[in-house]
């Protein structure tokens, strides 16, 4: 590599400079404090671990996004975490082994071999919250409410919510006896709202099932989409009715808690279909193609770790949250410039630091001209035998 190219970073990999790094860290602390006030306990997961553990129950999408290396100590294949959620699920199932509901949260960098979407980061800072041990819609309402509280605290403007339930499609596909290949093709067509393809793929199915699967491409919009779903899916199997009723219950609770929040429903929404088992949700803002936060229910993920538990949660990219939010996270760059040496100087500097002041001490050869570059607007000066804080001379 030529010397001139040594500063280049791989596509999708970023460095964060001051003051942006300070804004991100301030947001991280505020969000984790918010999670704490809701009763969520902070956990830290490994950056890298054995691949079979990292990908257990996570699905093919995560496999494709995971950087893989060989551990020189054991010869086994390892992966850098591309999603913290499965790691936290393992903690709940294997390490904590609590009987009742467990609320956990996390924040950390992840690494993607492939970006989530065009022009997105491959090194996001993933931040999220998970609730284990309760299968009721009340848990889904709690984590969605926490997510919305987080977005409100970050002052993300004009948020609207998209909600769906993968159990609706899964129940209809099971009742229709679709082969794995046809189910995948229909899944792709529904995601693209390709009505002609949906009609072709369901042409050989019995009338009621055919009509209900086709209806999923059209059952989207405001609250009326749920009411239409009740009518057009009235003949669906019990598991589909249960899924639809769960979605309606969650929608009612959110409408009561957040009366001004725009809610959009899509009964053919299959985000995370191979991973999620129930309600799926995402928060969007105008002009941004990707969701700013997303999540859903993923029951029984802990089964591969020896203990199946209901689970629901959400995650966000902290860097995106700071970029799209309008909260005042800027920390005023100020400080006190102290000379390199002097009688009693060390004690005076430490007193100021213990009082919460930012003090930058000069290194040999530096003078007050370096103070501005160090972000200082005051100086420590010896006057009448005492060290005193004074304005920095211009």
Curated annotation (Swiss-Prot):
Note: This function is generally fulfilled by the C-terminal part of HisG, which is missing in some bacteria such as this one.
NCBIfam families: hisZ_biosyn_reg, PRK12292.1-1, PRK12292.1-4, PRK12421.1
Pathways involved: Amino-acid biosynthesis; L-histidine biosynthesis; L-histidine from 5-phospho-alpha-D-ribose 1-diphosphate: step 1/9
UniProt organism field: Pseudomonas paraeruginosa (strain DSM 24068 / PA7)
Alphabetic keyword roster: Amino-acid biosynthesis, Cytoplasm, Histidine biosynthesis
Places the protein is found: Cytoplasm
Principal location listed in the UniProt entry: cytoplasm
Keyword Secreted: no
Gene: hisZ
Record-stated family: Belongs to the class-II aminoacyl-tRNA synthetase family. HisZ subfamily.
Record's protein name: ATP phosphoribosyltransferase regulatory subunit
Subunit structure: Heteromultimer composed of HisG and HisZ subunits.
Gene3D superfamilies given in the database record: Bira Bifunctional Protein, Domain 2
Gene Ontology CC terms, in alphabetical order: cytoplasm
Domain of life: Bacteria
GO biological process entries: L-histidine biosynthetic process
């Amino acid at each position: 590599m030529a010397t001139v190219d040594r500063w280049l970073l791989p596509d999708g990999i970023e460095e964060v400079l001051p003051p942006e790094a300070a804004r991100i860290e301030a947001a991280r602390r505020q969000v984790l404090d918010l999670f704490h006030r809701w009763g969520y306990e902070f956990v830290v997961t490994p950056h890298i671990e054995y691949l079979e553990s990292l990908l257990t129950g996570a699905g093919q999408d995560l496999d494709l996004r995971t950087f893989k290396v060989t551990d020189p100590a054991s010869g086994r294949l390892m992966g850098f975490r591309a999603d913290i959620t499965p790691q936290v699920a393992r903690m709940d199932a294997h390490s904590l082994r609590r009987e009742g509901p467990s609320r956990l949260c996390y924040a950390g960098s992840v690494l993607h071999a492939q970006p989530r979407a065009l022009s997105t980061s491959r090194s996001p800072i993933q931040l999220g919250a998970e609730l284990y041990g309760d299968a009721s819609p009340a848990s889904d309402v709690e984590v969605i409410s926490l997510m919305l509280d987080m977005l409100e605290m970050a002052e993300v403007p004009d948020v609207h919510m998209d909600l769906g339930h993968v159990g609706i499609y899964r129940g209809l596909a099971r009742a229709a006896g679709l082969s794995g290949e046809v189910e995948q093709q229909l899944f792709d067509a529904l995601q693209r709202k390709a009505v002609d393809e949906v009609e072709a793929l369901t042409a050989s199915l019995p009338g009621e099932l055919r009509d209900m699967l086709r209806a999923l491409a059209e059952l989207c919009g405001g609250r009326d989409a749920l009411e239409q779903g009740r009518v057009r899916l009235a003949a669906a199997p019990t598991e589909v009715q249960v899924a639809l009723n769960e979605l309606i219950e969650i929608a009612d609770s959110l409408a009561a808690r957040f009366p001004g929040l725009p809610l959009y429903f899509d009964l053919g929404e299959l985000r995370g279909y191979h991973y999620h088992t129930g309600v799926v949700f995402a928060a969007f803002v105008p002009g941004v193609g990707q969701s700013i936060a997303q999540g859903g229910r993923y029951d029984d993920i802990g089964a591969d770790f020896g203990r199946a538990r209901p689970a629901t949660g959400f995650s966000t990219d902290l860097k995106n949250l700071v970029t799209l939010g309008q909260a005042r996270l800027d920390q005023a760059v100020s400080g006190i410039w102290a000379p390199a040496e002097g009688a009693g100087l060390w004690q005076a500097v430490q007193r100021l630091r213990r009082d919460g002041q930012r003090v930058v001490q000069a290194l040999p050869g530096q003078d007050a001209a370096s103070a501005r570059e160090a972000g200082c607007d005051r100086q420590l000066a010896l006057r009448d035998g005492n060290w005193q804080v004074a304005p920095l001379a211009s």
